[in-house]
């Protein structure tokens, strides 16, 4: 049977050494962090398994890292898998029956579980038991298997795609938000120390401002800036060195990359600022709809460059200004700017 969990390092874990190991080391998400600390301490004091946890929010904000930290703070085992990997109900049953008492089972992209697998998960989460059908036809019978006390930690970028029965079984829903520049400066400073890279405060701020409020992107940009600085012979990464490297990576002052600018330019040039539907944009950009909705749009919405309306996506005045273009005559921005 194909391994459902991933015990070896994957490409996504290339920065595993930079990840915080405890809640105290974790930067940002202050309210979520404090609540988790309280829930973990309470569960340990009672001697119970922590209630099931759901992390949701845009990609790259630390959902997987927090799941690992939860297991480490509880002092229990950690097993990791993802929704698309669990193809059959039997796959999930195999995972659950191999858990030890108190273990944390992390399911990334939990919104992509199939309905059949999800049905198995309900009694497992609620009653710590599995209901399995044995046999077929008139002779089929249901057998209940007791499971160890465990904590399911789910992660999703699309909370709205979770079914209500599944969502309601998570006792601890935790929303993760984009990071501030100050928080990202701390993330970058810590990562630079671990990488042995000398970085000036203004250099860390320059990278932070272009990291789209996302620690994963901040770490990736920091490593690329390190490469440019090493080849250029910079002993310390200051704002000037960071700016030069990021410009070569085509990451602009707002943190937008080439794909973001293609998205904005398409709405501006072809659709006169919108509204335009997401399926049309996906076809024009040759990108899946999920990429548009999960990767490109959240940050553009966060910084106010675009708006989602019932009729489709539209550009706000700040987007026209960033592109260096004037809204077409008769557009909403053009009317309200007068």
From Swiss-Prot:
<keyword id="KW-0234">DNA repair</keyword>
<dbReference type="GO" id="GO:0009378">
    <property type="term" value="F:four-way junction helicase activity"/>
</dbReference>
<dbReference type="InterPro" id="IPR041445">
    <property type="entry name" value="AAA_lid_4"/>
</dbReference>
<dbReference type="GO" id="GO:0000400">
    <property type="term" value="F:four-way junction DNA binding"/>
</dbReference>
<feature type="region of interest" description="Head domain (RuvB-H)">
    <location>
        <begin position="253"/>
        <end position="338"/>
    </location>
</feature>
<keyword id="KW-0378">Hydrolase</keyword>
<keyword id="KW-0963">Cytoplasm</keyword>
<dbReference type="GO" id="GO:0006310">
    <property type="term" value="P:DNA recombination"/>
</dbReference>
<dbReference type="InterPro" id="IPR003593">
    <property type="entry name" value="AAA+_ATPase"/>
</dbReference>
<dbReference type="GO" id="GO:0016887">
    <property type="term" value="F:ATP hydrolysis activity"/>
</dbReference>
<dbReference type="Pfam" id="PF05491">
    <property type="entry name" value="RuvB_C"/>
</dbReference>
<keyword id="KW-0238">DNA-binding</keyword>
<dbReference type="InterPro" id="IPR008823">
    <property type="entry name" value="RuvB_C"/>
</dbReference>
<dbReference type="GO" id="GO:0005737">
    <property type="term" value="C:cytoplasm"/>
</dbReference>
<comment type="similarity">
    <text>Belongs to the RuvB family.</text>
</comment>
<feature type="binding site">
    <location>
        <position position="313"/>
    </location>
    <ligand>
        <name>DNA</name>
    </ligand>
</feature>
<dbReference type="InterPro" id="IPR036388">
    <property type="entry name" value="WH-like_DNA-bd_sf"/>
</dbReference>
<protein>
    <recommendedName>
        <fullName>Holliday junction branch migration complex subunit RuvB</fullName>
        <ecNumber>3.6.4.-</ecNumber>
    </recommendedName>
</protein>
<keyword id="KW-0233">DNA recombination</keyword>
<dbReference type="GO" id="GO:0005524">
    <property type="term" value="F:ATP binding"/>
</dbReference>
<dbReference type="InterPro" id="IPR008824">
    <property type="entry name" value="RuvB-like_N"/>
</dbReference>
<feature type="binding site">
    <location>
        <position position="308"/>
    </location>
    <ligand>
        <name>DNA</name>
    </ligand>
</feature>
<feature type="binding site">
    <location>
        <position position="18"/>
    </location>
    <ligand>
        <name>ATP</name>
    </ligand>
</feature>
<comment type="function">
    <text>The RuvA-RuvB-RuvC complex processes Holliday junction (HJ) DNA during genetic recombination and DNA repair, while the RuvA-RuvB complex plays an important role in the rescue of blocked DNA replication forks via replication fork reversal (RFR). RuvA specifically binds to HJ cruciform DNA, conferring on it an open structure. The RuvB hexamer acts as an ATP-dependent pump, pulling dsDNA into and through the RuvAB complex. RuvB forms 2 homohexamers on either side of HJ DNA bound by 1 or 2 RuvA tetramers; 4 subunits per hexamer contact DNA at a time.</text>
</comment>
<feature type="binding site">
    <location>
        <position position="179"/>
    </location>
    <ligand>
        <name>ATP</name>
    </ligand>
</feature>
<feature type="binding site">
    <location>
        <position position="64"/>
    </location>
    <ligand>
        <name>Mg(2+)</name>
    </ligand>
</feature>
<feature type="binding site">
    <location>
        <position position="64"/>
    </location>
    <ligand>
        <name>ATP</name>
    </ligand>
</feature>
<keyword id="KW-0067">ATP-binding</keyword>
<feature type="binding site">
    <location>
        <position position="19"/>
    </location>
    <ligand>
        <name>ATP</name>
    </ligand>
</feature>
<keyword id="KW-0227">DNA damage</keyword>
<feature type="binding site">
    <location>
        <position position="289"/>
    </location>
    <ligand>
        <name>DNA</name>
    </ligand>
</feature>
<feature type="binding site">
    <location>
        <position position="60"/>
    </location>
    <ligand>
        <name>ATP</name>
    </ligand>
</feature>
<dbReference type="InterPro" id="IPR027417">
    <property type="entry name" value="P-loop_NTPase"/>
</dbReference>
<dbReference type="InterPro" id="IPR004605">
    <property type="entry name" value="DNA_helicase_Holl-junc_RuvB"/>
</dbReference>
<dbReference type="GO" id="GO:0048476">
    <property type="term" value="C:Holliday junction resolvase complex"/>
</dbReference>
<dbReference type="Pfam" id="PF17864">
    <property type="entry name" value="AAA_lid_4"/>
</dbReference>
<comment type="subunit">
    <text>Homohexamer. Forms an RuvA(8)-RuvB(12)-Holliday junction (HJ) complex. HJ DNA is sandwiched between 2 RuvA tetramers; dsDNA enters through RuvA and exits via RuvB. An RuvB hexamer assembles on each DNA strand where it exits the tetramer. Each RuvB hexamer is contacted by two RuvA subunits (via domain III) on 2 adjacent RuvB subunits; this complex drives branch migration. In the full resolvosome a probable DNA-RuvA(4)-RuvB(12)-RuvC(2) complex forms which resolves the HJ.</text>
</comment>
<dbReference type="InterPro" id="IPR036390">
    <property type="entry name" value="WH_DNA-bd_sf"/>
</dbReference>
<feature type="binding site">
    <location>
        <position position="65"/>
    </location>
    <ligand>
        <name>ATP</name>
    </ligand>
</feature>
<keyword id="KW-0547">Nucleotide-binding</keyword>
<dbReference type="GO" id="GO:0006281">
    <property type="term" value="P:DNA repair"/>
</dbReference>
<dbReference type="Pfam" id="PF05496">
    <property type="entry name" value="RuvB_N"/>
</dbReference>
